[in-house]
Amino acid sequence: MNDVDDAARVRRRVWLIVGAVAALYGFLRLSFGPLPQDPAYHLLADTRTFLGVVPRAGDVLTNLAILAAGLFGLALRTRMTVAPEARTAVNVLIAASVLTAFGSAYYHWAPTNATLIWDRLPIAIVLMSLLALVMADRVHPLFARDAVWPFTALGAAGVILWGISEAMGQGDLLLYLIVRVGTGVAIALLLILRQPRHTGTIWLVAALVSEIIMAFFERFDHEVFRLTGGLVSGHSMKHVMVGVALASVFWWLRVRRMLTEKTSRR
């Protein structure tokens, strides 16, 4: 099969995935109705103010961990093992990582559904650009080029749909949740079921483990705050683990090396 056929096949797969996600959303939406945002989501544990200036300081300031990870990726960008067709996906991932720090800090400064949009939007783009890069490593290199914009548009659509539905009085998080959970599951399955084209898989595993720990901290925000005697909340630790996960991904892109075709199929 020649390069033209490969490119056409990858594009078909990309749009098949996008269509399947849209169909799954439609089925679940018709079957179960909208999934509203829990109003209690904004009632986070750490409400302390820093120097009388920074409200909810723990959750605001720990976004520095995410910013540091994004800047780490930016510093490594020119030294990453990345094919030309994957450069755009890497640039999107780095930019969205930096924007996640600012979007999250903005949300935690004044937690509302309106500000939460700017937290979730770059997160969705991070996840979908990462999925494109992992599929490039595990399925076909052209996924990095051909999937990055359709995938990130799909992720952004989940956030925008939720924002619009909230404004209309019937919030629906369903598509965003499919993107958020589905991306993690898809990456885990790709790591288990498909052979890599590059070394360094351990760093992707580290990112996935960080994601699992992050979810734990998010779920037990108040409990962690109580157990640490009010030192740090679960949500603040979530931000730290996001930074660890992103740094692990960027280090994977930096240290990985291309495997031979024979080795990658073992």
Predicted regions: what they are:
Residues 2-149, 163-167, 198-261:
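Early transmembrane hairpin module of multi-pass membrane proteins
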Residues 151-155:
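Active-site-proximal alpha-helical scaffolds that flank and shape metal-associated catalytic sites
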Residues 157-198:
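Active-site rim beta-loop-alpha module in soluble metabolic enzymes
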